[in-house]
């Protein structure tokens, strides 16, 4: 039972081909240290769920969030345009999300 609430400041995107189970994955980093992972499965595939993930060569775990591939565009926009960000996972309730770390001003893109 764990609760993760990890900040991150950079990411690395992979667009996979067969035979990978994930159609795409985004590894998240904080000051170069693995902080989380977002994976994308085929729409309708419910066999992949939010869970803990242990990066290779490490002794710690990070949150891994699973989304349908159809949401990759909105998540990439979120990563590109918002900061600071964090990834959160509660392994008891399985509640998981990406979020802005601070409040956003209303209408900040008005007039742009």
Predicted regions and their residues:
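Short, conserved turn/kink motifs that form compact alpha/beta structural patches or helix kinks used as
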Residues: 43-77
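Surface-exposed beta-loop interaction hotspot
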Residues: 8-17, 53-63, 106-112
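OB-fold ssDNA-binding interfaces and closely related basic DNA-contact patches used
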Residues: 1-44
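Low-complexity, compositionally biased segments
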Residues: 8-12, 19, 46-48, 80, ...
